[in-house]
Structures are given as C-alpha cells and as structure tokens.
A protein has these predicted regions:
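Class I S-adenosyl-L-methionine
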Residues: 289-335
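SAM-dependent methyltransferase catalytic-core segment centered on the flexible catalytic loop
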Residues: 220, 227-273
Length: 335
C-alpha cells in the first residue's frame, strides 16, 4: 500500500502502527468504521491512507497541489486504476514542442530525454490520476528522491560523463537509462496497490489550514505540520510545484523558527475535535518537546511520546541522525 506514496522526506509510513495503536487507547477500534479522521496537513498522504485502510472516513486537506493530487488519487478515489491504455495515451506525441520542463530544468534536474517526455506526458495528463503517475515517474528518476546536487549527478549524466559520477549513484544511472514506458509501467503497479475502497466517500480539500479546521467536523484531528526550523517543502519541491502550474508560495509559518507558536494559534480553533494527534520533531535538536507539550496543555490533557526516527537516512549526516527525535502528542478530554 505505501509503495503508492510519493517519497516525501517527512513521510510517516513507518510511524503509522504506533500512531494508530495510541489512537485505539482513546477511540476503540470497533468505532473506527463509524468515525471521521481529519488530516489537516495531508503531505504524502501516508497517515490518511493508513486511516482509510483501517476503516475511517477521511476528510483531509493540504495547500500544495502535489499533495491534493495525491489525496484525490489515493484517498478520494476508491476504484479507478491506472491501465496500460493510460500509459500509452500519456506517451502520444502532441506536437507541443519544447515545454517548461525542457526549457527550465535541463540539465540541473532532468536529462533532456526525460524532460522532453515529461513535457509531452503532462500535456496529455487530463486527470489527477495521470498527473500523479507522472509525479511518481519524476521521483523514480531523481537520485535519492531529492532535487539537489546537479553537479554530482544530473550535469555529468546529461553530458555522458559517467566516469565523473560517484559509485553511490550507480542505481540512479540505471534508473535514468530506462525507457519512459518501462518507468511508467513500474509506477503504474505501485500506484494501483494504493487504490481501494473503504466503503466511505472520502474528501480532499485545498484550503488554508485555519479555514479547513474551522469548517471540518470529525472525531480525530491529525496534525503533521512542517516542523519549525526545518527545510520548507515550498523550497524542496518547488520544481514539482512549478511543473504543476503553482505560483511560488512563501515559506510556511509552520516551517519558520516560530512554527510552534503558529501551531498554538491553530489549536485555538480545534476544540470541537475530541482527540488531537500531533506529529512533530526536534529538527535535530532545534525544537523542545516541553514547549510543544505546554502549548497543547493550554487546551486539554496531553500525553507525549518521544523516540528516535530518521528522515532521509540515505543523505542525512551521522550527527543529525543521532540527534533526530520524533514526537507523538495526544491531546484529549478524557478523565
């Protein structure tokens, strides 16, 4: 199921069993099929997808189009799968000439061969399902699913200077040499394993998070905001946003050094939700658990767990790995 997700660096797929075990202590599992799981920061969709599989009806939100597309494909969509005919339709020449990808992202992000294909395919992509498949394609050809280090890989790859590419990129050389249709077929299989029905009409929206929590109704509110003092998603994934026609957004207030205060403001409008579940991290030692517990405790009783967890393990420094901690906060009104 999780193979269907975009490999965001802040994804929570490994934490889902822990998150939902804690939820079961406050909301029994036998009630989940009749309960609503509200996800204020959808991101990759890992937690909402897991909640969908557990039987919750999902109401989720994100401000980024890439996440909204993921939600429409994996959360709202209960039955429509990617077919081989869809793949061939994306590959069909449309006479559009060079597009934004070939003009702006060669050679720093894509080789010309892949850029030209992606321009054609995105022009043919008429549904969120098509767009999502192409986002999966992009991550499949990006080294370590990141969008940096053009001098280490993309420029020598485009020029055929393979001897200048470190051996750690050997797999990524092979990935980039695959024909587009072969990549699409692989990603088709991964997307389809994440598409299923849970018997509910699940809902995805694209709203400011303050507006969303004011309008949403549900039993569990899950918040996994950008962590204060960390790399902003708007910067890390600006290539994807530009390809999807999004205007460059300012850095989220939740990513700033004062991000915890922004989260405190959000909680002011969340009293109607019986259970809060909050994922957060120490940003390699920049954030303090006690501060977040204090913010949540202003509104309700609070339980906190801290554990070691690595994001981007393949590229993070050893020092950062040793310092990184993940937190799970539960705010409840139980006696």
């Amino acid at each position: 199921m999780f193979r269907a997700l975009l490999p965001y660096y802040g994804g929570k797929r490994k934490l889902c069993p822990i998150i939902f075990k804690k939820i079961s202590e406050y909301l029994p599992r036998e009630k989940w099929a009749h309960s609503v799981f509200v996800d204020a920061f959808l991101g990759s969709g890992a937690v909402s997808l897991y909640a969908k599989a557990q039987g919750f009806r999902i109401v989720a939100n994100d401000i980024a189009e890439r996440s909204v597309i993921a939600g429409k494909v994996l959360i709202e969509n209960n039955e429509t799968l990617v077919t081989d005919a869809d793949l061939h339709r994306l590959c069909f020449p449309n006479g559009g000439g060079s597009g934004i990808i070939e003009k702006e992202f060669v050679p720093d992000v894509f080789t010309r061969r892949h850029a030209a294909f992606l321009d054609t395919a995105f022009a043919n992509a008429k549904r969120p399902l098509d767009q999502y498949l192409l986002l999966k394609y992009i991550f499949a050809i990006r080294p370590y699913s990141k969008f940096s280090s053009p001098n280490a890989f993309n420029r020598p790859m485009e020029d055929g200077r393979f001897d200048e590419i470190k051996q750690t990129y050997t797999k990524h050389i092979k990935d980039n040499l695959k024909p587009p249709l072969a990549i699409l077929k692989t990603e088709k299989a991964t997307v389809n394993v994440g598409i299923f029905s849970n018997g509910h009409q699940n809902q995805i929206s694209k709203k400011d998070v303050f507006e969303f929590v004011e309008e949403a109704e549900g039993d569990v509110l899950y918040c996994d905001p950008p962590y204060a003092g960390t790399l902003a998603y708007e910067n890390e994934y600006q290539v994807l946003d530009k390809i999807l026609g999004e205007e460059m957004k300012p850095k989220s207030p939740f990513s700033s050094d004062g991000g915890m205060e922004a989260l405190g403001e959000l909680f002011e409008g969340c009293q109607k939700f019986p259970l809060w579940v909050i994922s957060f991290g120490n940003a390699g030692g920049k954030n303090e658990l006690a501060k977040l517990v204090g913010i949540v405790s202003k509104h309700r009783k609070c339980e906190a767990k801290e554990f070691a967890y690595q994001h981007c393990g393949a590229v993070a420094s050893e020092a950062h790995k040793q310092k990184s901690r993940e937190w799970l906060i539960l705010g409840h009104n139980a006696n």
